[in-house]
Structures are given as C-alpha cells and as structure tokens.
UniProtKB/Swiss-Prot annotation:
Family membership: Belongs to the universal ribosomal protein uL2 family.
UniProt-listed GO biological process terms: mitochondrial translation
UniProt source species: Helicosporidium sp. subsp. Simulium jonesii
Cell compartments where the protein resides: Plastid
UniProt subunit comment: Part of the 50S ribosomal subunit.
Entry annotated with the keyword RNA-binding: no
Keywords noted in UniProt: Plastid, Ribonucleoprotein, Ribosomal protein
UniProt cross-references to Gene3D superfamilies, sorted A to Z: 2.30.30.30, Nucleic acid-binding proteins (2.40.50.140), Ribosomal protein L2, domain 3 (4.10.950.10)
Domain of life: Eukaryota
The keyword Zinc-finger is annotated on this UniProt entry: no
Gene Ontology CC terms, in alphabetical order: mitochondrial large ribosomal subunit; plastid
A family per Pfam: Ribosomal_L2_C
Gene behind the chain: rpl2
Name the UniProt record assigns to this protein: Large ribosomal subunit protein uL2c
Matches recorded under InterPro entries: NA-bd_OB-fold, Rib_uL2_dom2, Ribosomal_uL2, Ribosomal_uL2_bac/org-type, Ribosomal_uL2_C, Ribosomal_uL2_CS, Ribosomal_uL2_dom3, Ribosomal_uL2_RNA-bd_dom
C-alpha cells in the first residue's frame, strides 16, 4: 500500500493524506461493493461517551455516521476446519480491514485481516497447522522469531492483544510453561504457552499516516472537538483563566488537577505486573 497526498483544490483536501489502493494487487484490495454478512452484524446504540447516569465518562465522543457492528471471530474455535478467504472488507468500527472467511462446514465468519493474506487463500486453526499467514496456533507451537497478532491473555478467552492496524508481537523466548513476547509497546511479557495467536501482523500499517484533512471527517467518525485547557475559564480547567494568552504557570494538569504529560498512569502493584518482572523494555 502507498500513501497519496491530495492536491489543495479545496480547504478540506489541503492536508488530506489517504491510502492509495489503485496500485495494489486485486487479491489484497478491500472491496466496498459487497454488503456485510447479515448474520455477523449487530445494531449498536451509541452512548455519546455517557454512563448509565448520563454523566460524561469519556470526553470528545458523540455523533458520527450510523454503522453496523461486524462480529469478529477473535476466538478461532473451529479447530481443524479449513476456511477460504472470500473477500477483504472495510470495517468502520476498527482501524484494520477484515477478511470474510467461508469454512468447509458452510459457516461464514469475519477475522482481522493479516498483512499479505490474499483472496482465495486457505487458513486453518490447529495445533499442527503450518506457519502460514492467517493460521492460528497455540504459542507453544510457534517458533521463536515469528510475528503474530490477535493474542490471547487467557487460554480460550479469544484474542485481545495486537488487533489494530499494523500491529504485531514477536515471539522472543520460550520455557516449559511460558512464552515471552515482545509487544508493540516495546515491553516484553510472559504468556501462558496454551494461549492462541494468529500468524502474521495486522494489515493497513499505513493507517497511522492518514490525515483526515478537515474537522468534518472527525465528526463522521464520532469524534467531537478538543478544547485546549488554556483557552478555558479558570473554573473549568487548571490551565484556564488569565488576561490574554498566559503560560500554564504550574505543573501540566488534567481537567481534574492530576499531573499530565509524561506521568505514568499504570498502577505499580497491579496483579499483572508479575508477567513483566525481570523483563526490560527494549
């Protein structure tokens, strides 16, 4: 995939950067003509960032285009059943594309589309599956140096890690019970070797270079404007108030007065810290 910067014909296209699919192989190009699988979609009601009390718990959410949720098979539980990639589709609910799989038993499912998985390719989930892109195996069956995605935290729960566009983890070390993976963040973590993962990294790695070009496209995605703290009143934000433009005048803070910008927010005594013990970030 390559990137394309649009000419500044209009204000909205001045800084617009998109993914150019015109030079890509037809076997890897996502299709927008086919409707999503009816049995694999759900209607989702947006909460506009509010909880059940109506209080805003996540700011800058609201609006957006109406969409159907595609049910993704994160838990590849059709063991030993081969499936064929029928189509590659756009998913409005995630950064990566998705692949429509037609299994030999007649069922149809969606999976996260790995980079390089072509239309017409066959995939399978098995402990003795070949190390081909899109195949799912337990970590104990995956050799060191393999790039993987859709990784389980707990055996049988379904993939929860490395699912966004362009992400992948690397198998770096193996013991009798655990496998060490280098995560997209750069940290290494221990995983139970009975957890399953999918071979390859997620497609659409160029997503991080996309520039929406105008505010309206953010609103289509359900993202509302973010107002700088220094532009607010003192009653609304610790950075607010003052005459004209004023410096922060204190430690950079969140709207609730907690330290911001570079402060670690992960709890040092969280139970899962044991899986990082003795492993340094590289």
């Amino acid at each position: 995939m390559t990137l394309k910067k649009l000419n500044p014909i209009t204000p909205g296209s001045r800084h617009r950067v998109i993914i150019d699919y015109s030079k890509q192989s037809k076997l890897l190009k996502p299709s927008t003509k086919n409707a999503p699988l009816k049995k694999n979609t759900l209607k989702i009601m947006t909460t506009e960032g509010r909880n059940f009390h109506g209080v805003i718990t996540t700011r800058h959410r609201g609006g957006g285009h109406k969409r159907l949720y595609r049910i993704i098979e994160f838990n590849r539980n059709k063991l030993g059943v081969s499936g064929k990639v029928n189509n590659i589709e756009y998913d409005p609910n995630r950064t990566a594309n998705i692949a429509r799989i037609h299994y030999q038993d007649g069922s149809k499912k969606y999976i996260i589309h790995p980079e390089g998985l072509e239309k017409g390719a066959n995939i399978i989930a098995s402990a003795i599956a070949p190390l081909s892109i899109g195949n799912s195996l337990p970590l104990k069956s995956i050799p060191i140096g393999t790039e993987i995605h859709n990784i389980e935290f707990h055996p049988g729960k379904g993939g929860q890690l490395a699912r966004s566009a362009g992400t992948g983890a690397l198998v770096s070390y193996k013991t009798n019970s655990f496998v060490t993976l280098k995560l997209p963040s750069g940290r290494s973590r221990y995983f139970d070797n009975k957890c399953w993962a999918t071979i390859g990294k997620v497609s659409k790695a160029e997503h991080k270079f996309i520039n929406l070009g105008k505010a309206g496209r953010s609103r289509w995605l359900g993202i509302r404007p973010t107002v700088r703290g220094s532009a607010q009143n003192a009653v609304d934000h610790p950075h607010g108030g003052g005459e004209g433009k004023a410096p922060i005048g204190r430690i950079p803070s969140t709207p609730w007065g907690k330290p911001a910008l570079g402060i670690k927010t992960r709890h040092r005594h969280k139970w899962s810290e044991r899986f990082f013990k003795g492993l340094k970030k590289k």
